[in-house]
Amino acid sequence: MSKAGSDASSISCSLSLDSDSCDDEFYETNLNKLIENTSLNWIFVGGKGGVGKTTTSCSIAIQLAKKRESVLLLSTDPAHNTSDAFNQKFTNKPTLINSFDNLYCMEIDTTFSEDTAFKINKSDFLNSIIPELLQSFPGIDEALCFAELMQSIRNMKYSVIVFDTAPTGHTLRLLAFPDLLKKALGYLINLKEKLKGTLNMLQSLTSNEMEFEGMYDKINHLNTMSISIQENFQNPLKTTFVCVCIPEFLSVYETERLIQELTKKNISCYNIVVNQVVFPLTSQDANIESCEGLLKQIKDTNIKDSFSSLILKAKELEDVYISRRKLQSKYLTQIKNLYGNYFHIVCMPQLKSEIRGLDKIASFSEMLLQSKDIPIYSPQ
């Protein structure tokens, strides 16, 4: 985290939906601004594995369904936890979520597929040489699949799409695909001009009537599509990213890395959801009557030793609770100092049970709209 302080200064109000709104009132500690923003088409939810991305994306989708005509929750995480979250099986086709008439879910695989990659022409010869030409662009196979996927998504008639993404590394790779496509397809287009004579000669010598112009028409189409996707990514009126983390070192570090990459790619990000936060048992930590104090009262009044033993066990639990609060407060303070002036930071409480099933997700989603102070430990 040594770069945290210097990197924080690079994050400006340009990350927010409304660059003219940089006052404290705008950065409320809830997601109301996100839900009420009817111009958004794509909302990406991402972060480190195991921090509650799926729960958060499902909750956001539920709230959006109350405001928008039609909502699609799209899982690009290979683990596909959305089915488990809703206790309902989803596939690669949009499926209506139980109890809703405008909220759909689908689970897709964004990894490389032999069935779709490089099939830009019916010619077997061309399909064999294109991969060779693109060997200098590692990951182009996945990028082409991603381009086809995003084109399909753009053709879907939903008011807004919520992306439940894979862990940070995979997500950053996915967001880099438009740049990779632009470079690779630009390379092929330039290659056409350099090798135009050779390609024409090959076409005249072969018997399978290769349609080189048709091939480059497809390449130009892919290039135009990739540019359009990139423009959509970088339009804060249409696309935004919600970062999800927990108040622990690795998660906060990955969140910082993710926000830096989003900033470099000019992708809007103005919301951070911090899950599994231990809140004080009362409005202030100092108001908690400690087990140590109770134990002193017991000793003063000569109550039986067996009851004293129970209080000692409770004291151990109290120590764990306070230690957890102190540890989380360290990272909550870092989050507040780094992003408090530019982001909606929403702290969600550690709950007693797993958030599975529509009712529990719906309850969690309501909490995303409720403002809560960042619970920094302060015993005095």
Swiss-Prot record:
Main enzyme class: hydrolase
InterPro entries assigned to the protein according to its UniProt record, in alphabetical order: Anion-transp_ATPase-like_dom (IPR025723), ATPase_ArsA/GET3 (IPR016300), ATPase_ArsA/GET3_euk (IPR027542), P-loop_NTPase (IPR027417)
Origin: domain of life: Eukaryota
Alphabetically ordered keywords of this record: ATP-binding, Cytoplasm, Endoplasmic reticulum, Hydrolase, Nucleotide-binding, Transport
GO molecular function, a single term: ATP hydrolysis activity
Disulphides: none
Gene3D superfamilies tied to this protein: P-loop containing nucleotide triphosphate hydrolases (3.40.50.300)
Record Pfam families: ArsA_ATPase (PF02374)
Family, as annotated: Belongs to the arsA ATPase family.
Subunit comment: Homodimer.
Protein name in the entry: ATPase ASNA1 homolog
The species this protein was found in: Plasmodium chabaudi chabaudi
